[in-house]
Design a protein with these regions (language model features):
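Amphipathic alpha-helical repeat scaffolds
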Residues: 46-50
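N-terminal "domain-start" segment that seeds a small globular fold
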Residues: 12-35, 55
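Single conserved hydrophobic/aromatic residue that forms the stacking wall/gate
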Residues: 1-11
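Proline/glycine-enriched tight loop/beta-turn segments at coil->beta junctions
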Residues: 37-41
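Structural microenvironment flanking redox-active thiols in thiol-disulfide oxidoreductases
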Residues: 53-118
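Thiol-/selenol-based redox modules, centered on thioredoxin-like
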Residues: 120-123, 127-175
Length: 175
């Protein structure tokens, strides 16, 4: 059953398509093909370097360290779409994240989320999970199961290493 609780939504019964159709460019210009991650859980977060939620990079890295042995794929998607809070180049974003948070999870290049130039992944999120799931700000989070289906989303205020999220990741890993 679909359920709406605060800033998250359980959408297992609504989602029909999987994420394996989508590609991103990495912060280093290489291809990130989600099809390469079939059979693994995926956690996607839209990010920004100058946001009040930027501290969540540390929480995301904590997830990376905790779950990398279980195959969790984490992808951060820097964007300047919300409050112009991203740095001016991919190189600056990479340096910022390395120096300040020592991240080891994947980052895409700076990516459009909103509007006509918005990445197809986010259009898919809106189609599959509804308007509320579409990012309204930085640090929206999307949890995808081993079949490539979007099963949960979380708004900016939900910390990546919260019990809400880690409990769901644990469930997916055990499937």
């Amino acid at each position: 059953a679909s359920c709406l609780v605060g800033s998250e939504m359980c959408i297992r019964d609504r989602v029909k398509a999987n994420v394996y159709q989508f590609n991103f460019k990495s912060i280093d210009g290489k291809e990130i093909n989600l099809n390469d991650f079939k059979g693994k859980p995926i956690f996607i977060v839209n990010t920004a370097s100058l946001c009040g939620f930027t501290y969540q990079y540390s929480d995301i890295e904590t997830l990376q360290q905790k779950y990398k042995k279980d195959g969790l794929i984490i992808i951060g998607i820097p964007s300047n779409d919300f409050g112009n809070q991203e740095l001016s180049s991919n190189q600056k974003v990479k340096e910022f994240c390395t120096i300040n948070f020592d991240i080891s999870f994947m980052l895409t290049e700076i990516t459009n989320i909103k509007g006509e130039k918005g990445h197809p992944f986010f259009k898919w999120v809106k189609k599959e999970a509804g308007f509320l799931a579409f990012p309204k700000w930085n640090f929206y989070k999307y949890l995808i199961n081993k079949e490539g289906l979007l099963v949960k989303w979380y708004a900016s205020t939900t910390r990546p290493n919260s019990n809400k999220i880690t409990t769901e990741i644990d469930k997916i890993i055990l499937q």
